[in-house]
Structure formats: structure tokens, C-alpha cells
């Protein structure tokens, strides 16, 4: 289990254009790293659109927003285009970052047990350390909660 104050696990994953993006690319900037289950599903779409609506606020605070799911690059391209998402989406089909951040967990729905991404957001400081962990966030309010936290 990751803890506040520890080094955030490094990753290198493709973005929606196939470019490899690493967490270390953003040393010197704060990073909002949000893990979500699936492109184009109701909760994930609301969460992404809320981040898009708040994007200028993140930029004004020199904060990079990165969304990660196990969806394909093509899925991310379509998702970003459909909803005009201005931030980085990374594809993690091999669960590299998803597992290293501990968000691939058992889920229960109507008595059925499966594994999937538990919607979780990490705020990573300018030195690459975990500053805040927000587990099981609400998709509609996650972006606003982070902006409030950053403004404190």
C-alpha cells in the first residue's frame, strides 16, 4: 500500500498519440494522477469532463493532469476527441502503473466478484513524492475537491 510522503512509483506509458510519457517527465511540477475504470462509461465520462472544465485552474497552478486506465490508445483518442479533453490520457493495458499504485482491486457488484480499477486520485508533489491519496473518489466532485485542496 502506498503512503503519503513516499516516492511515487515511476511509469512509462503511451499517451493517446502513442508518445511515451513518464512520471519523471514532470519533476518540478505538481501532478494530479487519476486512475479510472473505463473510457466512455457514465462515471468516467463525468469525471473526465469535470477535469476538462477545471483544466484552466490546474494550468494556472502549474499542475499537470494525467488520467490512466487500461483502455487502448485508440479508445483514448476517441474519448479525448469526443469530449475535447485537454489533459494527458495514458494507456495501461498491462496494468503496469495500475498495479504499482495499488488500484487494481477486488470489486463486488450485485454479489458478483471481479477485479478492476478502483477510482483513485493521487497528488504528486514537485519532487515526485505522494502528497495526497484520494481513494474511491466521486467522479462529479473529484476535480473541484483537488482545486480546493490546492488553494489551501
Regions of interest found by a model, annotated:
Residues 1-152:
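Chalcogenol-based redox active-site neighborhoods
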Amino acid at each position: 500500500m502506498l503512503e503519503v510522503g513516499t516516492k511515487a512509483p515511476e511509469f512509462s506509458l503511451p499517451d493517446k498519440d502513442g508518445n511515451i510519457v513518464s512520471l519523471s517527465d514532470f519533476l518540478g511540477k505538481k501532478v494530479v494522477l487519476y486512475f479510472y475504470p473505463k473510457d466512455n462509461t457514465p462515471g468516467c465520462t463525468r469525471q473526465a469532463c469535470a477535469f476538462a472544465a477545471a483544466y484552466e485552474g490546474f494550468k494556472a497552478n502549474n499542475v499537470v493532469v494525467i488520467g490512466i486506465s487500461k483502455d487502448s490508445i485508440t479508445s483514448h483518442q476517441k474519448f479525448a476527441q469526443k469530449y475535447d479533453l485537454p489533459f494527458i490520457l495514458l494507456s495501461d493495458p498491462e496494468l503496469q502503473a495500475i498495479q504499482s499504485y495499488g488500484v487494481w482491486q477486488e470489486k463486488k457488484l450485485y454479489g458478483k466478484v471481479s477485479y478492476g480499477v478502483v477510482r483513485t486520485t493521487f497528488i504528486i508533489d514537485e519532487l515526485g513524492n505522494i502528497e495526497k491519496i484520494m481513494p474511491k473518489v466521486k467522479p462529479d466532485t473529484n476535480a473541484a475537491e483537488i482545486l480546493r485542496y490546492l488553494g489551501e
